[in-house]
From Swiss-Prot:
It is an enzyme of class 2 (transferase). Its EC number is 2.6.1.16. Pfam families: GATase_6, SIS. PROSITE patterns: GATASE_TYPE_2, SIS. It is found in: Cytoplasm. NCBIfam families: glmS, PRK00331.1. HAMAP family: GlmS. Keywords: Aminotransferase, Cytoplasm, Glutamine amidotransferase, Repeat, Transferase. The keyword Mitochondrion does not apply. This is Glutamine--fructose-6-phosphate aminotransferase [isomerizing]. InterPro entries: GATase_2_dom, GFAT, GFAT_N, GlmS/AgaS_SIS, GlmS/FrlB_SIS, Ntn_hydrolases_N, SIS_dom, SIS_dom_sf. GO terms for biological process: carbohydrate metabolic process; fructose 6-phosphate metabolic process; protein N-linked glycosylation; UDP-N-acetylglucosamine metabolic process.
Length: 612
């Protein structure tokens, strides 16, 4: 991990693209960066720990320029955060490699290569790739494509790699297995990247590589491509919908703030498919109706924020569609003994569509005999939709901040639409209820905007939170996952320890933490559980805890000493979890501002998790 770029340019200096592309990948998270460029007859390399700008300044100072090169932002997995461990890695002055992923058998490969006389300068698994390719390159008489083909046969794990050779200044070879990689085509220039955001300022014509692909590139495009079976293949070139403007924060201080405020638009765009065409199976794929008619239960697999969206969906699926639903963390599911049901729909959720644990969990489910799969993700042409029989994309647009915001709320919209659609197919929803759900969905962007208007009040709360070291979030029923999401957001970007519990579990342990120094955030909409939540709040107040309550206009809460209340719009029915997500996002954002942390790029975290 975490970002790859590369290019062959016939008429321009490749360093301009490499540094610009790496800066556009900074949002994915990293600890060091580097580039390798064919310059003045040899491969020249610059690596630095810290920001890409430090590395760029060093490259400019050295006067590095050329027409072919590769670059990388690293998020340490094997080996510490040091310059020798940063990419690119070079073998024998001949082969330079950048790599995302993890080579699981790197220790045995390292011993094999050491036995062949190769010396290692780093602790990384990537240096194994460089030496292995160099060895094959020397053995086959200098054929780079074939050297990569042979080398990758030895690797176990996930990888996306880009390779250049000192004596092949017009060839760039790439390979993909389990980690994202694309090829972008310009005029007499060809680019590669792990994310389309890196290339969008230079071209919008992209081809997404698939697992097992190996490609030979020149400045005029893809010269050779083989698939996982070693057979010649082609990958369709598409015009990306992403615009350069979407990759800038505009008038906002941070991408996270921008993306929080983009939620009314993102939700409206995502809901459009249901509002225009209705809750019909065809929204999810051509054969969705027959799949939905045949399934008896649902299994949802996801990680991180997407897992909390899945937990929310469980309530909708069981209450609206009347279908049993089970939710699991993908990284846990893929390593346990599972009883498979071929009539169960497996749903996977991932913002990027490339989350490795989620992808591998889906493959595992299919290997056990699951016949039906549906993915919910935000990135067109990503791996997860290609592996799934059905798909519905969120329309959140590019999300740059590491802490997910609009991707989460648009996932909720899609999952709500799925629940109502399944209810229709199963004949368990009345026309009156369907009309009510449609109207709630239509009004949702406006309700979210009303919640955004609470920002000044929430920012005032944040000044108090900034001085705390821990926080507790409480919710009940379908709002418990929103409490989980609020706690995750706070810990991600403020580094304040935060936990979330169902409010009814207070007496089973968490109440021991409550004192005057522990802020307790309560999600308290005016639903059937409101009186229960109020009773739980009394328990907190009796122990001297300070309560911060996100309520509805009609929840009948009064602010008193030790009880702070902010009222969201009037209760909006089944979609209340979406509206109540916004205040906890804003609380985390403004607390991070008050503490002076890096909002968009919090420490130790990556946007797209493409390794275990």
């Amino acid at each position: 991990m975490c970002g790859i770029v590369g290019a062959i340019r016939a008429h321009h200096n490749v360093v301009d693209f490499l540094t610009d592309g790496l800066k556009r990948l900074e949002y994915r998270g990293y600890d060091s960066s580097g580039i390798a460029v064919y310059s003045d007859g040899k491969i020249k390399r610059v690596r630095r720990v810290g920001r890409v700008q430090l590395m760029e300044d060093a490259a400019r100072e050295k006067g590095i320029s050329g027409g072919i090169g590769i670059g990388h932002t690293r998020w340490a997995t094997h080996g510490g955060v040091t310059e020798p461990n940063a990419h690119p890695h070079i073998s024998g002055g001949m082969i330079a490699v950048v790599h995302n992923g993890i080579i699981e058998n790197f220790e045995s490969e390292r011993k094999r290569l050491e036995g062949l006389g190769y010396r290692f300068e780093s602790q990384t698994d990537t240096e194994v790739i460089a030496h292995s390719i160099n060895h094959e390159y020397a053995q086959n008489g200098g054929r780079l494509f074939e050297a990569v083909q042979e080398a990758v046969k030895r690797f176990h794990g996930a990888y996306a790699i880009a390779v250049i050779a000192q004596d092949k200044p017009d060839e760039l070879v790439v390979a993909r297995m389990g980690c994202p990689l694309l090829v972008a085509l310009g005029d007499d220039e060809t680019f590669i990247a792990s994310d389309v955001s890196a290339v969008i300022a230079f071209t919008r014509r992209v081809a997404y590589l698939e697992d097992g692909d190996i490609a030979l590139l020149a400045s005029d495009g893809i010269k050779r491509l083989t698939d996982k079976n070693g057979l010649p293949a082609e990958r369709k070139v598409k015009v990306s919908e992403l615009s350069p403007a979407s990759l800038e924060p505009g008038p906002h201080s941070h991408f996270m703030q921008k993306e929080i405020h983009e939620q009314p638009r993102a939700i409206a765009d995502t809901a459009e498919v249901f509002l225009d065409g209705g809750f019909i199976p065809e929204n999810f794929g051509k054969n969705a109706k027959s799949v939905f008619e045949s399934i008896r239960s649902v299994k949802i697999l996801a990680c991180g924020t997407s897992y909390y969206a899945a937990l929310t969906a469980k309530y909708w699926l069981e209450s609206i569609a009347k279908i049993p639903a089970d939710v699991e963390i993908a990284s846990e599911y893929r390593y346990r003994s599972v009883i498979a049901d071929p009539d169960q729909l497996v749903i996977t959720i991932s913002q990027s569509g490339e989350t490795l644990d989620t992808m591998e969990a889906l493959k595992y489910a299919k290997s056990l005999g699951h016949r039906h799969s549906l993915s919910v993700c935000n990135v067109m042409e990503s791996a997860l939709p290609r592996e799934s029989s059905l798909v519905l994309y969120t329309r959140a647009g590019a999300e740059i901040g590491v802490a997910s915001t609009k991707a989460f709320t648009t996932q909720l919209v899609v999952l709500f639409g799925l629940a109502v659609t399944l209810a229709k197919v199963r004949g368990v929803v009345s026309g009156e209820d369907e009309a009510r759900y449609t109207e709630e969905l239509r009004q949702l962007p406006g309700s979210v905007q009303h919640a955004l208007n609470l920002e000044p009040q929430i920012a005032a709360w944040a000044q108090q939170f900034a001085k705390k070291t821990s926080a507790l979030f409480l919710g009940r029923g379908i709002h418990y996952p929103i409490a989980l999401e609020g706690a995750l957001k706070l810990k991600e970007i403020t580094y304040i320890h935060a936990e979330a519990y169902p409010a009814g579990e207070l007496k089973h342990g968490p109440l021991a933490l409550v004192d005057e120094n522990m802020p307790v955030v309560v999600i308290a909409p005016n639903d059937s559980l409101l009186d229960k939540v109020k009773a739980n709040m009394q328990e907190v107040g009796a122990r001297g805890g300070e309560l911060f309550v996100f309520a509805d206009l009609d929840s009948n809460f009064n602010a008193t000493e030790g009880v702070h209340v902010i009222r969201a719009p009037r209760h909006v029915g089944e979609l209340s979890p979406v509206v109540h997500t916004v205040p906890v996002q804003l609380l985390a954002y403004h607390t991070a501002l008050a503490r002076g942390t890096d909002v968009d790029k919090p420490r130790n975290l990556a946007k797209s998790v493409t390794v275990e």
